[in-house]
Amino acid sequence: MNTNMKVTCAVCDSDRVKKIRKKFEAHYNQVPVAIENAEMYRCESCGEEFFTAEQSRKLSRQIKNRVREDLGLLSPERILEIRKNLGLSQAEMESLFGLGEKVVTRWENGRVIQGRTADVALRLLEMDPGLLPKLRKALTRSRPPKVYA
């Protein structure tokens, strides 16, 4: 964030704001999450507490990381490491798992939390990379036939 940027309160337009840290509680997909030292601003004029865009992005990353930890899911860094160790591109992994475009990118940069099924599949492939050719073969057999008019 630009440290020269002047922060003002959106409620009362005062520039008497102070950066604070406090516990922030939220729910992410019905999972309760508490971030102990969330950075935010408090207006000294009206008492409003708010986040800048950068603080909000940082808090969102912290919340998603906490949810991953609490649910026992792989971190974005581990997903990237597993994919690279398997020699797969992001597009190949998306095709292999039947995912939409850019889903793996979002997992790896932490913007989206992978589901339990994908997490287990990644762990299995990490434990036994020999499953990769078997998975590819199974996918070629299970694809619906092309319909020609």
Task: Write out the residue ranges for each language-model feature.
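Residues immediately within or flanking Cys/His clusters that coordinate Zn2+
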Residues: K6, M40
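Short, charged recognition helix plus adjacent turn
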Residues: L135-A149
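Extended interfacial segments that mediate partner engagement and assembly in macromolecular machines
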Residues: T52-T117
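DNA major-groove recognition helix of helix-turn-helix/homeodomain DNA-binding modules
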Residues: R116-R136
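Short cysteine-rich clusters marking metal-coordination/redox-active sites
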Residues: C9-C12, C43
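Short linker/helix segments within small regulatory modules
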Residues: H27-N37
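Cys/His-rich microdomains that often coordinate metals
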Residues: D13-R16, F50
